[in-house]
């Protein structure tokens, strides 16, 4: 599992460690790890052209000390000082002692084999200064390595207020930063490398599951399991206008780990034709039989409100998706009732956050994905799976997970229906709402990648089919 810590948490841990270590030890550890990554990227260090972009403070110092280490191995290292009056004097002295030189020629940015971005550290806010912003749009041929964080990206949120440097590799010290895992910041970070420097950190408020974490969470039938012990998921989806949504939601549910799927709705004939193993009914949700979780809303049309009422009247967890989200936004937060998992995209999130007047712009919410997911979770007292370029799962206490899988090809009709069904099935199989949403997003993203392996458009049905090979 990847864990990310806020700037405040990192600063506190650094302060505690520096109080126990000789002066300069912590920066030395960071610089050594940074230089080691750069050496691997260069392959041959001797004769390589390296440009250090050094801002003020410790971030620039890390870059300068790393540049000095590379210069000692024969690299031609030049430093472009973005804040000469506030440069880290120890780092600059070390670079010069190793044979590095200071340059004022920004054209070297485009010719270096490797560029170290040490302009702004994790405390930076509000975008880059004009001289640094010019570099963000300049052409370069070499590899850009960000020191702890690409300059221009907010470390805590991933927001990008203006110009930012787009890194090929980001070397993180001590822990990942939230802004490296969440778009838009994640799209500027490139490949992440973590360098341990000995920090003692509290539990992380933001994490990202990896393969082993998901494997440990997935339900595995025991020797005495039957379909009822494994859990039964109910799907209330589809309408005369959108019967395919029911078929796709059921397809996702069948791959989620529950022992059986019950369907309640007007698309019963289409569902049983495609999935004969499903138990179907056309009456109320209560008449469908006992379930351990409900999925309500995909393609529900005008009937989504009635279905939502029926699900909220019961005790089992409810996945609220699509048209049911629109109905929930109209009503506002619900107090009491069963556990909810909301699955909005940015447009639905905007409606859910509207408190009279105009809704917030979906584009603004997308640019602040972590903050948006947490606001929704707190407002509705529910786990929220905010879909998008980076899917974020948040719960009301502020803890969140970022999904590291997926592909832009998943932006296709019906993909969300498959995800909702998969999520409901994992809930019925016994996972907590937070774990079920996290695992569903992960598996859905992997299935999308597999389906799009040839780099061509995919359908939601293909995503559902590929869930079978990413269990």
Model-derived features: positions:
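Nucleotide and nucleotide-moiety/phosphate-recognizing core
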Residues: 36-119, 127-147, 317
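Small-residue (G/A/S/T)-rich helix-start motifs and N-terminal tracts that mark the onset
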Residues: 1-79, 114, 167-169, 178-322, ...
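Internal gly/pro-rich beta-alpha loop/helix module
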Residues: 113-114, 119-205
């Amino acid at each position: 599992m990847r864990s990310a810590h806020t700037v405040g948490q990192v600063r506190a841990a650094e302060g505690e460690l520096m109080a126990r270590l000789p002066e300069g030890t912590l920066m030395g550890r960071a610089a050594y790890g940074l230089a080691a990554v750069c050496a691997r990227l260069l392959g041959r260090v001797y004769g390589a052209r390296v440009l250090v972009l050094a801002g003020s403070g410790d971030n620039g110092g890390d870059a300068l000390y790393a540049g000095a280490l590379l210069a000692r191995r024969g690299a031609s290292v030049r430093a472009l000082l973005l804040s000469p009056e506030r440069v880290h004097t120890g780092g600059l002295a070390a670079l010069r002692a190793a044979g590095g030189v200071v340059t004022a020629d920004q054209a070297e940015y485009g010719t270096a084999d490797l560029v170290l971005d040490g302009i702004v550290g994790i405390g930076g806010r509000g975008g880059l200064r004009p001289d640094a912003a010019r570099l963000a749009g300049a052409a370069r041929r070499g590899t850009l390595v960000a020191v702890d964080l690409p300059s221009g990206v907010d470390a805590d949120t991933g927001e990008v207020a203006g110009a930012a440097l787009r890194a090929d590799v980001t070397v993180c010290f001590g822990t990942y930063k939230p802004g490296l895992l969440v778009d838009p910041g994640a799209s500027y970070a490139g490949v992440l490398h973590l360098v341990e420097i000995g920090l003692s950190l509290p539990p992380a408020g933001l994490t990202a599951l990896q393969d082993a974490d998901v494997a440990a969470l997935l339900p595995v039938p025991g020797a005495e399991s039957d379909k009822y012990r494994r859990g039964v998921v109910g799907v209330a989806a589809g309408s005369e206008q959108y019967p395919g949504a029911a078929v796709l939601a059921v397809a996702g549910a069948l791959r989620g780990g529950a022992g059986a799927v019950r369907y309640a709705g007007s698309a019963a004939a289409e569902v049983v034709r495609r999935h004969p193993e499903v138990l179907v009914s056309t009456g109320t949700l209560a008449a469908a039989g006992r379930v351990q979780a409900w999925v309500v809303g995909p393609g529900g049309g005008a009937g989504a409100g009635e279905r939502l009422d029926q699900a909220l009247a019961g005790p089992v967890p409810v996945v609220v998706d699509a048209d049911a989200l629109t109905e929930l936004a109209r009503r506002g937060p619900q107090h009491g009732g069963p556990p909810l998992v909301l699955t909005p995209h940015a447009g639905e999130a905007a409606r859910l956050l509207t408190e009279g007047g105009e809704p917030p712009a979906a584009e603004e919410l997308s640019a602040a994905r972590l903050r948006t997911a947490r606001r929704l979770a707190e407002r509705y007292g529910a786990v929220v799976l905010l879909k998008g370029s980076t899917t974020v799962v948040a719960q009301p206490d502020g803890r969140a997970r970022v999904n590291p899988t997926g592909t832009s090809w998943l932006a296709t009709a019906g993909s969300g229906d498959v995800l909702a069904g998969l999520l409901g099935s994992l809930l019925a199989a016994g996972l907590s709402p937070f774990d079920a949403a996290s695992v569903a997003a992960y598996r859905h993203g992997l299935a999308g990648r597999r389906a799009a392996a040839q780099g061509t458009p995919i359908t939601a049905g293909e995503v559902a089919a590929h869930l079978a090979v990413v269990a």
